[in-house]
């Protein structure tokens, strides 16, 4: 948090940095014209999936480790608020620098490894120090994110063994899952984002990173979330949800609101996100 604050102050002090602040906080409602709102919804949905680790079993897995005394309703409010605050701090550390350096406000590796590096270069003798700290923290973030992904798969397999009354070796399971994920992600390294010098060809019109992004953000996450919302809203129903949320005397505040979200808002929203993601990736023209 302190590092983001220092970086944010530095970037906001750059020339023309106010354009970055305008980009972040001045809404452009013209993007909602026609079918534009679908694209905005799809983009926001993709951000939510990755930022909050939704649709990938991470939240469910970590949630199952919570003490029964914890309020699920309270935690479901605190987590998104804290995530939004951190995202805003990260935006303040990056977006002013994007415009100050005359770059396009795009996302992805270029924003992280090109734009931010330009900021550190402008910081003089402290630049290399802050640059090292920044990319070290990015490395730590990647490792901790990988842990959450591995934990979801590993715990599901362990739970299946426990349900059958079989023994298991957690270290071996985690090692196997980690090795499989490492092998699965090798193509993204060998492909080099589809640029010259890569050792692996693109898959169709997509580089391997975009292809995995399509599978994860474009299909699996919204589809899985859609199915889960339907299961919770229509198969498990309100009584089961309330029995879980109300453990140890916790109150199910906003019960009607949450169930409306499960039954109506979430399924419709996830269906639109799924359609919007597929439309964006394949230029299907579904909403033209």
Locations of regions flagged by a protein language model:
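Single conserved hydrophobic/aromatic residue that forms the stacking wall/gate
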Residues: 1-12
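Membrane-embedded translocation segments of transport machinery
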Residues: 13-147, 161-173
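Hydrophobic alpha-helical transmembrane segments of multi-pass small-molecule transporters/permeases
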Residues: 44-48, 80, 132-142, 178, ...
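Transmembrane alpha-helical segments in integral membrane proteins
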Residues: 53-68, 139-155, 225-242, 281
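Transmembrane helix-loop boundary segments of multi-pass membrane transporters
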Residues: 74, 105-114, 130-138, 156-172, ...
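Membrane-embedded alpha-helical segments of transport systems
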Residues: 81-90, 180-187, 220-224
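C-terminal membrane-solvent junction of multi-pass transporters and transport-like membrane proteins
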Residues: 154, 161-178, 211-270
């Amino acid at each position: 948090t302190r590092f983001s604050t220092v970086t944010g102050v530095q970037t906001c002090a750059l020339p023309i940095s106010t354009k970055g602040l305008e980009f972040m906080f001045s809404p452009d409602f013209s993007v909602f014209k026609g079918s534009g709102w679908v694209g905005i919804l799809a983009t926001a949905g993709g951000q939510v999936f990755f930022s909050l680790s939704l649709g990938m079993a991470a939240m469910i897995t970590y949630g199952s480790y919570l003490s029964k005394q914890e309020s699920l309703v309270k935690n479901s409010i605190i987590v998104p608020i804290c995530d939004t605050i951190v995202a805003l701090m990260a935006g303040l550390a990056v977006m002013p620098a994007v415009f100050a350096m005359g770059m396009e406000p795009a996302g992805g590796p270029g924003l992280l490894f090109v734009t931010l590096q330009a900021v550190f270069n402008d910081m003089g003798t402290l630049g290399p120090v802050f640059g090292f700290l920044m990319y070290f923290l990015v490395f730590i973030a990647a490792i901790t994110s990988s842990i959450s992904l591995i934990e979801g798969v590993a715990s599901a397999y362990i739970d299946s063994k426990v349900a059958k009354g079989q023994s298991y070796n957690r270290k071996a399971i985690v090692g196997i899952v980690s090795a499989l994920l490492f092998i699965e992600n090798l193509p993204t390294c060998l492909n080099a984002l589809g640029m010259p010098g890569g050792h692996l060809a693109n898959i169709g019109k997509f580089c391997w990173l975009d292809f995995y992004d399509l599978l994860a953000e474009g299909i699996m996450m919204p589809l899985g979330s859609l199915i889960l919302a339907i299961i919770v809203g229509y198969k498990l129903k309100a009584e089961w949800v309330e029995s879980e949320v109300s453990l140890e005397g916790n109150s199910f505040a906003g019960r009607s609101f949450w169930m409306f979200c499960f039954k109506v808002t979430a399924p419709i929203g996830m269906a639109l996100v799924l359609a919007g993601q597929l439309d964006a990736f394949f230029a299907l023209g579904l909403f033209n």
